[in-house]
Amino acid sequence: MIALRIVVCLWLSLLATNLNAEDVPDEDLQGLWGLRLVAFAQNFPAYPSSSDQNFTALPIPYPVYRGKIFSFGQDLEEIASGQLLSTNRFNVSVGLNASFPESSDNLSARNGMPDLDFLVEAGPEVNMALKGGPDDDRELLLSLQIRGAVSIDDLDATGRGFTFNPELEYLVRDFLDAKTELRFRVSPTWGTSDYTDFFYGVDPEYATANRPAFDAASGYVNTEFLVGVNRKISDRLEFRGSIRLWVNKGSANETSPLYQQDYGRGIRLALYWTAWESERRVASTD
């Protein structure tokens, strides 16, 4: 029965993408399937409020699928998404994103504590166009996201609670020219106690004279401010970059010994090269 449902969902996705492509100009079409190589570098705080930065630079090959109902591999921000309901100005979907692990040996406040494992977050989101639309040069978007978090250590998975994450994003298409897009985003985050404990909790066995035991509380985590630019260099090559500021002040866990600073900064630079695309074309959603 489950296999039948999967087949039906994939069939509906293929049917929807075919119908969607019929009314789209050729220059706005991309392959339904593709293979990309992304070379990216980022320098972010190791965790919210950490004074230690996590620098990551990797080349990653990965497949891309641009289905109308289900898609994956189109952006580093969101690994995969599934559309539950979609109109020109409103959609309900399920999203999946992840964070890199970090060794506590490299973190001044967490030295001697368990590592911060690979963190996967998934859940529903409601996206609304408050002003403009996908065909306009300017668009104001509101996204309301709920994510369930799971940390993964080898084959062990541990539930890490939930987050609520509203996002307000302003898109400027055709910035300077038709190949450049500018975006501004404000995104506060609230988390349950299981989520905040992952970053700020200190079990008694890891307590020291300078790091007392601490039970993390649910509540406000921080707010992210982002300025990003996407630049299409050629049909196969695209640059995406962003700078970010995190405001941690006012966090529900400011008194944690693992809370280190009120502000954080970050940068991400990425080059996306499309190595291959299928002959079947669909409307671009990148």
Name these PLM-found stretches.
Residues 25, 48-53, 104-110, 153-160, ...:
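Outer-membrane beta-barrel translocator domains and adjoining extracellular loop/strand segments
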Residues 33, 53-59, 88, 116-122, ...:
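Residues that define the transmembrane beta-barrel architecture of outer-membrane proteins
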Residues 36-42, 75, 93-97, 141-147, ...:
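Transmembrane beta-strands of outer-membrane beta-barrel proteins
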Residues 39-43, 59-65, 78-83, 122-130, ...:
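Residues on the lipid-exposed face of transmembrane beta-strands in outer-membrane beta-barrel proteins
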Residues 42-48, 99-105, 129-133, 147-155, ...:
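Sequence/structural signature of outer-membrane beta-barrel proteins
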Residues 58-60, 262-286:
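Outer-membrane beta-barrel "beta-signal"
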